[in-house]
Each structure stands twice: as C-alpha cells, then as structure tokens.
Amino acid sequence: MGIKNLYKRGVMGLYGVAYAVAALAMTVTLDVSTVAAHGERSQEPFLRMRTVQWYDIKWGPEVTKVNENAKITGKFHLAEDWPRAAAQPDFSFFNVGSPSPVFVRLSTKINGHPWFISGPLQIGRDYEFEVNLRARIPGRHHMHAMLNVKDAGPIAGPGAWMNITGSWDDFTNPLKLLTGETIDSETFNLSNGIFWHVVWMSIGIFWIGVFTARPMFLPRSRVLLAYGDDLLMDPMDKKITWVLAILTLALVWGGYRYTENKHPYTVPIQAGQSKVAALPVAPNPVSIVITDANYDVPGRALRVTMEVTNNGDIPVTFGEFTTAGIRFINSTGRKYLDPQYPRELIAVGLNFDDESAIQPGQTKELKMEAKDALWEIQRLMALLGDPESRFGGLLMSWDAEGNRHINSIAGPVIPVFTKL
C-alpha cells in the first residue's frame, strides 16, 4: 500500500468525521425542547413507595447566586416491606438528582457523619441527611435527594425547584492541594484535557480511516472464503499496526511518568465503606395492622382498612399519609405542614371514617382514604401492574402535646372500579 492510498484512506476517515459533525450541528439547530424535571415519575411505583420513604425534606434557599451555598436536608426510612424484586441496601450511596451538575456538592452527612463513599444501610431504620451545595449554573432546576442502591439503581426522593442567578462565567471552585497550591477545579488543566482528547481521537480517526477506505464486508468475505486471508494482509497494514501500537504504549507510559513527576502527591480513589449507625428508634405507642386495601381506579383513591391500637397515655390523631414524596393531609396534618414543601406534591384528600382521637388503650378499626389526581399525575396507579401489587408509605399521627409518631405501613392492594 503506497503513500497515496494511505493518504486517501485518512482523508476518507476525515470525511466520516465531517458527516458526524454535520449531523450534530443539525441536532443543535433544530428547535427541540429540553426535559426540565420529573423523570422520577418513570420509576416503578413499588420502588418509590416501598423502598426509601422520605420525610421532613427541606430545600434552601429557594434562590441562590452563583458561588453561594445551598442545602438539602431531611430524613428517610428504609421500609420493612422492601420488595423482593429490588436489591437490598447493603451497598448504598447517597446522591443528589439534578439536571446536570448545576450545583457542586461540597459535603454529605448521614446522621452527622461524613458520607463520601458507599456503605450498608439497615432496613427498617431511619437516617438523617444533610447535603451542602454550591451554585454553579444559572437557571431553574429541579433538585432531588437520591439513594443509589447497588443492583437496584437510583431511588429518587421528592424534588423541588431551586433557582440560581448570576453568570456561569463567575463560578469558581478553589481547592487547596497537598503541596499548598490552590487551584480552581472548574478550569484546572482544561487545556491538558483538550490536548489528550485531540490526540486519542486523531489516532482513532486515522485507524478507522485506514480500514474503512478499502472494500468492506461483503467483498472481503468473498475473498476470505475463496482464497483465504493471505490476500487480505497487506505488508503496509502490519507496519501501520506496529507503529500505532508502539505510539500508544509510548503515549501511555510517557503520560504516566509526566503526571507522576508533576503531581507527586495524590490521593487514590477510595474503595472502603461508610458505616453509620441508624437513628435511635423513637418510642411509638401506636401500632397498626393492615387488614384490607384497594385502589379505586376511576376514583383515583387508595382505601385502606386498618386496626389501630394506642398503647400510650395520650390520645393521638392521624393527620398525614406520605408515599413516594406525596403528602396526603387532613385538617390535623395541615397544622404541621411545612409551608415551603412543593405544592405540587401536597394532596388534601386524606379522610378517615372516624376522625376522632384514639384514646389511650383503645383499639379500633379505621378506614383511610387517600384520594387525589396525583395518583395518576405521578404515575403511581401503575402499581397495579407491578410484579408485587402492594402499597407502602408512612402514616403519621400526633398526640395532644404535638409529638409526632410515624408508622411505616404496607400491604397488598387490589384494583376496583366501584367504591367498596
């Protein structure tokens, strides 16, 4: 293979790159609207209702300037009725769901302890989290707390809109190295990254161009079947292969040695586990046994029959049922509702057949109805098509002194088309 053929094949490879760039330019110029939020609705209801049960979540402040700090705090309960179809949280990582890195995460704490690598969490227990963020990209962004569970995937919590003002060009993220030098990680070694991208892409384009310029699959297959592979092996192919192999090894070795000399003090990627004890179990005088549950499809209502016992010394009243980040409340729950909680996740359709307080030592049957269009808007009615048709959530009650008691409830649910 002569120099002309080699040049021809390289040029044809560049043509392929030009076509790809043209296709990319067309996608950029087309008027395509971006997806802003609510991707969590695509998750299966059994993951959102019966795995991580979020509560007391706060986002703040609502408006943040570039380079200013924000925070997401809250708690979550790992449901006792964890579905068999999902891997258990033996290896979990607390994360933040956002549309690209619009914030920089400064720190994460679980129960007051740093949490920067994965670790085990205990089913049936509660955890408190705090995530500190720094505003990076201006805009209106939908932010979620999120728990990534190995083999189960990300489990997103409720989301709220957080606004960032200012200019992206003003963002800086200074970090102090072990050598005492301070760098801006937003722009540090940007030219170096571009250089290596260009180097490896150029080698790849040249390699592809060499072999795509010649006859492709069918002609080569016919030659191979008729005459063997000797005719397909060009001496120049072997030379090019050796040159690129040696060049690749030299670049890898040289780049490694250069990096070692320029940055002698490095911290390797951590491979351990974060182990944090769960929150202490709070005394709860309320016990609940689910006896029946159904979902009214046309009425968009979950109806649950339960047997409730108050083992305490103070009357208690139910006021909230929260599931998948949706808070169903009645007049009692409204008194304790956080006014900053996203309005699109609040439903006032929580009713009990007996709204009176449960007296100390009393056991009675209650029928709860959680009714709202949010069942369909949030795509939770799809639980009827899950491999385990079961519901789950947190039922909250308050006593006369304002103390809150939280019960995680779950049970099988059947669809109905008339009120039973």
Curated annotation (Swiss-Prot):
**Cofactor(s) demanded:** Cu(2+)
Residues where Cu cation 1 binds: 38, 144
Q: How is the cofactor bound?
A: Binds 2 copper ions per subunit. The two coppers forms a binuclear cluster.
Could you say which residues bind Cu cation 2 here?
A: 142, 144
Which superkingdom?
Bacteria
**Disruption-associated phenotype:** Cells lacking amoB1 grow more slowly than wild-type cells, while cells lacking amoB2 grow at rates similar to wild-type.
| Entry membrane topology | Multi-pass membrane protein
Q: Which reaction does it catalyse?
A: AH2 + NH4(+) + O2 = hydroxylamine + A + H2O + H(+)
**GO function terms (MF aspect):** ammonia monooxygenase activity; metal ion binding
State its role.
Part of the ammonia monooxygenase complex, which catalyzes the oxidation of ammonia to hydroxylamine, the first reaction in the process of ammonia oxidation to nitrite.
Q: What assembly does the database describe for this protein?
A: The soluble ammonia monooxygenase is a nonamer composed of three alpha subunits (AmoA), three beta subunits (AmoB) and three gamma subunits (Cytochrome c1 PetC).
The name on file for this protein is Ammonia monooxygenase beta subunit
- Gene name as annotated: amoB1
